[in-house]
């Protein structure tokens, strides 16, 4: 691990600065050390859709590591003062050859992100907002939580709106609708109490 740290260099970004923009060519892996980064894409009409939020320990840039001609398809913007560790393509590839555990972790994360991206695209295209929200809440329930879990939202509601392809006003109304129906309870600190997960999922059908 000391060898990996020796190849990385730290870069600091102020709130609102971009790590990279769509269509920029790059060959680095970015690992968030401090702060927060939002990854988003723009539609042809200029509408922004959130892809994911990166917290300390999360990474991005993995898709450009294996293709020398690849360009970024998304934007990466620091949402607060942020520091990231950057490792160049050649060094990452050497580490992956030597450390199989890192290779498996990277491939696993890439697979999950690809699946999530495909699911997100399909849901925005064909599902209602309430169904998208219900499925989003359900995806944040861990198996060991049972059928009446309390979850912590992984992002602010305005970011959930962007992620689900709708507006903050609409997402607030839908949260209110679910609460009025007795399906959830909105608690403090981004916590949501799901009264009955089965009933919640049935409501979206």
Predicted regions and their residues:
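Polybasic "coupling" helices that flank or enter modular domains
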Residues: 79-80, 97-168
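Cyclic nucleotide-binding regulatory domains
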Residues: 17-80
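Short proline/glycine- and basic residue-enriched helix-capping loop/turn segments at helix->loop/beta transitions
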Residues: 1-15, 71
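ATP/adenylate-binding site constellation spanning eukaryotic-like Ser/Thr protein kinases
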Residues: 34, 56, 81, 89, ...
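Short, locally clustered residues in the helix-turn-helix/winged-helix DNA-binding domain
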Residues: 20, 33, 111, 138-142, ...
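Cyclic-nucleotide recognition modules
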Residues: 1, 52-111, 115
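Phosphate-/nucleic-acid-contacting segments
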Residues: 140-205
């Amino acid at each position: 691990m000391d060898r990996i740290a020796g190849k990385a260099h730290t870069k600091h970004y102020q709130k609102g600065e971009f790590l990279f923009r769509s269509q920029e060519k790059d060959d680095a892996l970015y690992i968030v050390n401090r702060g927060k980064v939002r990854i988003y894409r723009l539609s042809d009409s200029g509408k922004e859709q959130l892809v994911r939020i990166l917290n300390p320990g999360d990474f991005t840039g993995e898709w450009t590591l294996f293709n020398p001609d690849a360009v970024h398809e998304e934007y990466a913007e620091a949402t607060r003062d942020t520091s990231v560790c950057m490792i160049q393509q050649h060094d990452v590839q050497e580490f992956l050859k030597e450390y199989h555990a890192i290779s498996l972790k990277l491939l696993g994360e890439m697979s999950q992100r690809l699946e999530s991206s495909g699911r997100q695209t399909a849901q925005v295209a064909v599902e209602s907002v309430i169904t998208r929200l219900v499925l989003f809440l359900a995806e944040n329930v861990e198996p060991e939580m049972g059928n009446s879990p309390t979850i912590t939202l992984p992002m602010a509601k305005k970011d959930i709106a962007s992620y689900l392809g709708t507006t903050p006003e609409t997402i607030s109304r839908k949260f209110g609708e679910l609460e009025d129906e007795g399906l959830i309870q909105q608690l403090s600190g981004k916590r949501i109490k799901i009264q009955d997960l089965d009933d919640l999922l049935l409501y979206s059908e």
